[in-house]
Amino acid sequence: MTSIYTSDLKNHRRAPPPPNGAAGSGSGSGSGSGSGSGSLANIVTSSNSLGVTANQTKPIQLNINSSKRQSGWVHVKDDGIFTSFRWNKRFMVINDKTLNFYKQEPYSSDGNSNSNTPDLSFPLYLINNINLKPNSGYSKTSQSFEIVPKNNNKSILISVKTNNDYLDWLDAFTTKCPLVQIGENNSGVSSSHPHLQIQHLTNGSLNGNSSSSPTSGLLSSSVLTGGNSGVSGPINFTHKVHVGFDPASGNFTGLPDTWKSLLQHSKITNEDWKKDPVAVIEVLEFYSDINGGNSAAGTPIGSPMINSKTNNNNNDPNNYSSTKNNVQEANLQEWVKPPAKSTVSQFKPSRAAPKPPTPYHLTQLNGSSHQHTSSSGSLPSSGNNNNNNSTNNNNTKNVSPLNNLMNKSELIPARRAPPPPTSGTSSDTYSNKNHQDRSGYEQQRQQRTDSSQQQQQQKQHQYQQKSQQQQQQPQQPLSSHQGGTSHIPKQVPPTLPSSGPPTQAASGKSMPSKIHPDLKIQQGTNNYIKSSGTDANQVDGDAKQFIKPFNLQSKKSQQQLASKQPSPPSSQQQQQKPMTSHGLMGTSHSVTKPLNPVNDPIKPLNLKSSKSKEALNETSGVSKTPSPTDKSNKPTAPASGPAVTKTAKQLKKERERLNDLQIIAKLKTVVNNQDPKPLFRIVEKAGQGASGNVYLAEMIKDNNRKIAIKQMDLDAQPRKELIINEILVMKDSQHKNIVNFLDSYLIGDNELWVIMEYMQGGSLTEIIENNDFKLNEKQIATICFETLKGLQHLHKKHIIHRDIKSDNVLLDAYGNVKITDFGFCAKLTDQRNKRATMVGTPYWMAPEVVKQKEYDEKVDVWSLGIMTIEMIEGEPPYLNEEPLKALYLIATNGTPKLKKPELLSNSIKKFLSICLCVDVRYRASTDELLEHSFIQHKSGKIEELAPLLEWKKQQQKHQQHKQETSDTGFA
């Protein structure tokens, strides 16, 4: 559409009305007279006839059809999830400002409504967007669209009977609400609605100008993709499926398969879905978490896979622990794994130069590598590498060797340099000669560089002839700390084909004073390379890298001949960096002799200025980037070697493994490392807690005193830090209403014993069941009173138990009531005074836990209220429901109902009302409950609980009698 500006007009006046014939005819079916806005209704003003008089560019809005209306019968319903899902038939009229709905068709005159007040009037300016829902609605042939308001109110779903009416309504909304986005998924009209695109194209152009109706113009600018609008289609479009609720069908949309299966096998009905679909989603999330494997940070998982992501592979604790053990064991092996022998033996010096000392941690490996020198052969590429290195070293004397290494991508991460070995006698023999002939050596090094390529084949042949001779040569002792090799050859064998010159035995060029005897070792060790079948293109990154550090180090080593010589210049300090990087990596030669005198053996590595030390640190930092060739040999390197790019999942696993090792180390400082098996005798299994089994045992050295042993397999514990947490809480929470902690023992690295006092009376659950659920209010008040005192002690220490229930409240033979099982406990801090972790047992959980909201100590008060109902009715609420339905009822029903409240006193009902208050703000604290009239007036002494333990005594007598009878019969 050609824009009309005020500068194009000579006489400013209102545009004339459109011709009468241009108006679209109304639809007899209710399409409305304003449905058609043809191209003849458009006013095209020629700029030639009007002239151009100003430079203003403010466009004039031509809303020709604003006085027209669209009307017709439609079916309407709200998009609310709590409303009726019937489609209501209404007569809809869209005016300039409102969208009106009538129960009956209004009388119309001059395009205005003269009927009764509309049933619903919706201002057009409140429309945020219109979502198209084709092929859906009241009937199979209906088309629907959804009007989404700006004020977050319920959306309005409108179903139109025919496709023509559907398109007419869209045209009307486009005309009346030009700024409203119309399309699927709030992203404008897609190409699946061809009418809107055809409207843009068929409304034509005049004289080559794309002059269309306001309807089509607005569509082209705000809705359409492609075409003459110049707007491209969406880029990188993604459709994220999320869980929702379709009120039309009454079903959820986008449910994962796991959730679908849970709903199909649950007792949650369609009425439950429609009543509170949000609660159903919350329950599904919660139930999946407590039965899956999704451990989040800071989430205790001491119970069967609490807080785990829904993953069928992780549901089996044994499978989880075995997999984790394998990964952890592999990681530990990776740390202690020595470099491959071929890695150490693949290096050949590029020239006859002194060798750096062997790092301490590789001396034994070098010795073992030296034993494989009987095989012959060499790597042709080694000579090429050495040649390139020697040439670069000669031509770039003033350039930092570290930069050369970085350009070759051959840096390897470094660790701290090990102490050098003590010097040998051979070092003293040749150090003076090297010092005297240093200038001559520099001159001949250039000659070696020039003649290296020509002599390559000759040296290879000579080296093969001398390979066996090298095996038979006498050897001299190495340094005291080198474990695997005790002798080194006294005669230098020929070098590998490289840039270095022929040696004394292989060439006519005699350089007796330039060759350090320690080079003999390295030249011999390379025989192992070819016999192992190593390809030249697959040479380990360490092997390639060592060539440069070796050459760069040789010059510095010569300049450190005298023990009192000044520190080398900065260029030589930089030359030390590659050697240090390589030496720390552990891929050095079998050279153990420093070039210093015997009385100062530390100088080759330690004779550095402060700047040299800084250079070493820089090398360690820069060399963390691995070379490409290091990746293939990564398994043979120590764990601290070249860092291969790892995924976030791998890094997370490594952090978990390191964390587990740290936890085990921490645990060893908390527990007793003595073997407990000789101290105790297991009698029988007494029960099972959140993090392990509980056994009845006897202390052998304490007159067979009965104690309880909680035995835990650490490998089966997804969160080992919780075990430390439980032990520390029990140690720090000595109280008469908390089970007394005696000691703990760690057997190996995976078995933990926690020794606690034995409660002969058993759990409160057993007492309730074996007394025919006939606890009177006085006994209930006494048990609640004793339990509250223990909870008060914990809450004063800002500790939440989070698993209060009858199973975790124990009684002894005297009626003492004590809290046990701290596997789910958590400590609140000033920085974190609330928790949101989903832990506990579903039937005793507070609503805020099920809904995954933040909570504090008052979740224990709710659980205490549920435990009180247990003592009254024999079971917690919803116990007969399957867990998913129970969670739904907890989240939606709020305070549970009593089965027979008329049988209870007002005091206990008031006590329950403040314990089971859904609003946490009004739920009582332990301090308030201890002051409650039910506790103050109804509770008694613990001796009054003794009758509840008669069943235990009768049971013990029966067992003794049965045992005596069996013994007598056997005799």
Swiss-Prot record:
Keywords per UniProt: ATP-binding, Kinase, Nucleotide-binding, Serine/threonine-protein kinase, Transferase, Virulence
UniProt domain Protein kinase: residue ranges: 680-935
Bias kind Pro residues: ranges: 491-500
E.C. designation(s): 2.7.11.1
Transmembrane segments: none
Region described as Disordered: spans on this chain: 1-40, 201-221, 292-517, 554-653
Domain (PH) ranges: 67-178
Molecular function, one GO term: ATP binding
Signal peptide per UniProt: none
Compositional bias per record (Basic and acidic residues), positions renumbered to this chain: 434-448
Ranges annotated as biased composition (Low complexity): 307-326, 365-404, 449-482, 554-578
Family, as annotated: Belongs to the protein kinase superfamily. STE Ser/Thr protein kinase family. STE20 subfamily.
UniProt protein name: Serine/threonine-protein kinase CLA4
Source organism of this protein record: Candida albicans (Yeast)
Lineage: Eukaryota, Fungi, Dikarya, Ascomycota, Saccharomycotina
